[in-house]
Every structure is written in C-alpha cells, then in structure tokens.
Amino acid sequence: MLSCAASVVLMTGCSLTGFGPDKEAERTYTVPGKVTALSATTHGGNIEVVPVDAGGQVKVTEKYVYNERKPSPSHEVKDGRLTLEAEDCGMGRRCEVAYRVLLPRDASVDLRTSGGDITVRGATGGIAAETSGGDITVKDSTARTAKARTSGGDVDLALSSAPDEISGRTSGGNVTIRLPKGSYAVEATTSGGNRKVSVPTDEGSAHKVTARTSGGDVSVVPS
C-alpha cells in the first residue's frame, strides 16, 4: 500500500433508493512516482480517466456512497502499474465506489465495473474497458488498441488516429465507432437493430474494427 496525502469529506443526504445508501464520502490523493499503466476495478461505481497535464501528478478521486459500512478501497503502485480496487461491503450492505483518475496520456488502462459507466478521454495508451450494466465512452483517443464490452449499455468509441484494432460489444445497447480517414477491415453485426458502415472498407486492411450488438444499432462512421 503506498502512502499518500488524502483529504476526506463525509456528508449525509437523501437515500438514493428506498433502502439504498444514504451516506456519501470523497477522498482525493496524489500518486508519487511514474505511472505507465492503470488497473481499476469497482463493484458498482463509475470510472473516469482524464489526461493530466505534462509534468503533472497522477491524482485519484474516490467517491463513496454507502449505508452502514464505509467502503475501504485499496491502491498500490508496482512496476509502474497503479492498481485501484474496490469490493462490495459484504453481508448485504450496499455501497459503491466511483473513481476519477488524472493519468498520463500514454498510460494503458484496464477498467472494470459491475454496474457503472466508464469514460476515457485523451488516451494514447491501450484501452480495455468492461462493465456489466453501464455505458462505455472513449473520446479524443489515439490508442492503437481499444476494446470495450458492456452487457446492457451503449458503447461510443471516438478515435482521432487509425487504430490497429478496435472493438465495441454490447448485449442490449447501441455501438458507435468513430474513425478518421482511412480504410478499415470492418465486422459490424446486430441481431435486432440497424447497421450503418460509412467508412471505406477493405478486408485486407491492417486496421481491424469489430462492432457487435444483440439488440441495438451498430454504426461505424467517420469521426
């Protein structure tokens, strides 16, 4: 566990649901040293990754909602990888931990949440994102690889340079992939919605694109 200077604010407010969490807390801390990769896992909150200014410090904000027991997420840095992990509170207690991380653009990210949204902005490192019930959004990215999967939400991936491989998959929402000029090997399928591919396609292209949904629309369009 790395040491850090942290600020904590505790608030009480209205219950999010009739029997849901009714307390909130927030903690922000900086992470010393060089971070080249991020792994973040949370039981039910959102995850947001935004670029830090050149030379700036990596900073993490954790936002908690809970009822009886305050969450105790962990964080550590090993070999340049920052690992954030938040489990449920156990014994039927309800709680969520949401993350907002200021991160170098070139750091790779591996993000997983059981029920929240995932948002990544300005990344140039590889992206892997998975959520059970929320949306996944990638904006202004030049990542060479990006993979996004959600069971019930929408996927919207916008790249400003041609990736080597990009994929968006959802069981029940829409998939939209936005790409710059170029030709792409595209596999775009939907079982119950509309299909739109308006970028130049070439089965032999080195730029592989996969977009799949079982129940929504699928679109691969110019950015």
Language model features with spans:
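Right-handed parallel beta-helix
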Residues: 26-33, 71-140, 156, 176, ...
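Structural motif
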Residues: 34, 43, 54, 78-79, ...
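Charged, low-complexity, helix/coiled-coil-prone segments
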Residues: 17-19, 43-57, 69-73, 124-135, ...
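Active-site alpha-helical segments that house and flank conserved acidic catalytic motifs
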Residues: 38-40, 111, 129, 148, ...
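Exposed beta-strand and adjacent loop surfaces of beta-rich binding modules
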Residues: 37, 57-59, 72, 108, ...
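Short, surface-exposed interaction patches in beta-rich subdomains
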Residues: 139-150, 154-223
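A broad, low-specificity signal for short, low-complexity segments enriched in glycine/proline
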Residues: 19-23, 36, 43-48, 71-73, ...
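Short acidic/polar N-terminal linker immediately downstream of export determinants
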Residues: 1-60, 65-67, 89-96, 195-205
